[in-house]
Each structure stands twice: as structure tokens, then as C-alpha cells.
Amino acid sequence: MDTILRLSHITKSFPGVKALSDIHLEIVRGEIHALLGENGAGKSTLMKILCGIHQPDAGTIEIDGTARHFTSYHDAVAAGVGIVFQEFSLIPHLDAVDNLFLGRELRTRWGVRDRARMRRAAAGIFARLGVSIDLDAPLRTLSVAQQQFVEIGKALSLDARILILDEPTATLTPAEAEHLFAIMRELKRQGVAMIFISHHLDEIFAVCDRITVLRDGQYVATTDVSSTDVEQLVRMMVGRRLESSFPPKPVRAADAPAVLEVDALQIERDGPVNRFALHAGEILGFAGLVGSGRTETALAVIGATRAHRKTVRVRGTPAKLADPADALRAGIGLLPESRKTEGLVTSFSIRDNISLNNLGKYRSMRWLIDRRGEARTTHDVMRRVGVKAPSIHTEVATLSGGNQQKVVIARWLNHHASVLIFDEPTRGIDVGAKAEIYGLMRELTARGYAIIMISSELPEIVGMCDRVAVFRQGRIEATLEGDEIDPDTVMTHATAGTRGATHEPA
């Protein structure tokens, strides 16, 4: 094998925790190599060592047989290592050309920025990728997929021979993900070695050649994709056989009261009119393609965005939800799609995040907070939702994706919200944590909570939801329940708009 990268005996500790112990990883030139493991398995730490962001306590890095010691990210880049982070490192108001050459602009013999030469070079890079990018448009005006391609182009412009792709499909549509896979296959043909990090096992089998699995900071195994299956990979990642990750659906009570009724919701003046109802103890799925209006509908209901007209009843009482504060007072909570930027203050502790929108509950005097009472409540809700952390004072930024999501849920339970809107609740979460989130959702509905679940994961919609409202172009095309909820039926309504069910509340 033509080995381009070899990591041997990599060990790394942080105060109070051993993040990596004797890790081995070998990458062959021109292969796509998956790095798998639950959140907290050590994948990010290992990649940060490869990129020079962290230095190992022990072990060696070899590129093309030569030992390397990276003391900075620039050292790694100079050695041919590039990374496309899950959170983009682009400047939104700059165009693609300026983002590609930021900090290393090409100049004329007189020291002036040579925009024309940089533009030609950028065009050549995107031609190599086979993508069409408006070179003069600010990045913020491009689609998420196009921004992803700019990130990849930026790494290639630095002559990356080893490319790390960290959850690159997390915010892409299926069609955009397929385009990305085509680009990866072309780069593979050109001899670029890629390390692909993803929680979507179907993507691993679609595009990767080999897989290395980490668990609890330790090396588990490396295997060819053709020699394994999903069940074996899951067992290697979690250390046990994972039964069906979806809890059994309970028998739906026919007389369950409607806790949220939305009538005549019209977001735009000339847009479609939608109606739906949510009952106590159920999970109502919002399914459809990206851009079909699922999230937009939820945000309009709680007043986070304007609606041309809407009528809402909460537990049978008319409610004027003009803004999220009104929704909060009505007992409606939102777990937003982007938990890190919209759902959490990641620099705050777990305690501060959980009590953030309910500080009045802990006021002991006019301006003082009862910290002991706050701590007791925080411990209680952390236990109820299963947050795993050293203490209530742990900074949320240090938690895994699954535990961060549980902190958001804990905040709403602390506020006694009984209607919860989960927008892409398992995005960026490993298989074990997904099963925990699913179990928690069923525990909540068993206690009478009502949940709207917005998800682009079709198996999630089918496996978790008691009823499903399928969206297409802003309209609820069908409301499915029981045996009607299957992948083919959902996708038929989402793509073809076949109206097999009513638009009225079920």
C-alpha cells in the first residue's frame, strides 16, 4: 500500500481526562477513510493533533515516511494537511476569491493585490471540483452547499494532499450530499487522501474505502467497508449490540386532548394556508424536503417570524403568540436546528444555560439569585434528562452534541413547557446518543408532553412519529398516521404532492 499518513501510539491527556490512548491510524494515498466513533470517542482530538492545533503527549506522525512534529496549524498546512471544519471558517461578507486567498493574497511585482490572477486561480480550483460558484458574490449569498465547496477549494488551494472532512453533509440536502460525494470521488482519482467523519453510516458505505473506529479514546479496529456491516460497526462504536434505536410506539389515546391547535396559518399574503393540531402524549412529525416550509411554519406559530394571519389555541384557549416570549408564557419551547448558535450560550455553564430563561424563579431578594435553589433544580433536571457531565458548572462548549441537546431540553423542562418543538434534534449526534434522545422523547410523551419533531431523517420520522404532516412548497400536503407512515408514502407526498389526506387537524 502507498501509505501517505501514519499515526502511531498517539496519546493525549487533558486535566482530569485521558482523551487518547495509544491510537493508530494509517491512510493510503487516494483513499477515502472513515473515522468513526461516538461523540467523545476522541475523533476531534485526534484530528486537531493532525492539524497542529494540539500536540500529542506521545506518539509519532509520519507523512510520506517522514516524521513530522506540528506545533501549529500552519505547520500542518505546509506539510499538505487540510481540514474542512463542521463550522465554516469563511468570512461571510467576502467573496469566494477573497476567502480562498485570505492572508496570502497574490501580488503584482509592485506589491499590489493581483485580483485578476487570484480570480483565475479560483476559477481553476472550482473547475477541478466540477462546481459552479459565483466568484464575485459575498459568501453569505451562496447556498450552504456552495459554501462547503468553497471550504474544500480553500484547502485544495493550499495544496492539501490529506483532506479532513468533518461532518461535511450535516447541513446539506440529499442531492447536495451526492454532489459532494462526486467531488470526493474525483479528488480520490486525483490522488488526494481523505479522512471522512460522519455519523451517517449509509454515507460511509456509499463513499468510503476503509473505516477506523475509536471508542473512549482508544483504537478499536480498522476494516474494509466491504468486510463489515452496520450492526458490526455500531457494536464496535458503542461496545455492545444496539437494539432498534426507536422505542416502541404506544397505542395512541383516542380521547387525548389537543394542546396546540393552529388554524388558518398563512405566512405570506399569497401563500398556502395550513391547519394542524397537536395532542397530549403524541409526537407529530413535520416531514418534507429542505425548504419545504417545516421550520418556517414552526417559527411562525411561536411568533419568531411574522405571519400574514394565524389563529392559535393552546389547551383550548385562544393565544396571541406575537413573539417567542408569548410562546414561552404559553408553555411552548423550541429546540432550534442550530443548538450551538441559537439554543445555547456555549461559554456558559450547564447551570446557567438551564436557568437562563427562568431566573425569576430563583430570585430570593429583589436583585439576588438563590444559587442553592438554582443548583438543586439543575441537578434534578440534569438527572431527569440524563446529562452526563462532571458538574453543573461544566462549560457547555465542552459537552458532546447529545449532552448539549439534553441541556436545551432540560431548560424547557425547568420552565415547565409542555409543548416542545424539536427541530433536527439528532443532527450531529452519534448513534448511541440518538437512541438516548429518542428514549427521552418517549418518556416525555408518556408523561403527557406533546412534541413536534422536524426532521430530514426519514427513518427518524417513520420510527418516532405517531402522526406525520408532510410539507411541500410551504403546504401541508398530507397528514399520515398508523400504517400510512412509511418511507415511500412520505416521500411521494413530499416530492409529488399527492394529496392523500386532509389539511384539517387530525
UniProtKB/Swiss-Prot annotation:
This is Ribose import ATP-binding protein RbsA 2. It comes from the Bacteria. It is a peripheral membrane protein. The keyword Cell division does not apply. Gene3D superfamilies: P-loop containing nucleotide triphosphate hydrolases (3.40.50.300). GO terms for molecular function: ABC-type D-ribose transporter activity; ATP binding; ATP hydrolysis activity. Its main location: membrane. InterPro entries: AAA+_ATPase, ABC_carbohydrate_import_ATPase, ABC_transporter-like_ATP-bd, ABC_transporter-like_CS, P-loop_NTPase. The keyword Repeat applies. Part of the ABC transporter complex RbsABC involved in ribose import. Responsible for energy coupling to the transport system. Pfam families: ABC_tran. Its EC number is 7.5.2.7. Coiled coil: none annotated. It comes from Burkholderia ambifaria (strain ATCC BAA-244 / DSM 16087 / CCUG 44356 / LMG 19182 / AMMD) (Burkholderia cepacia (strain AMMD)).
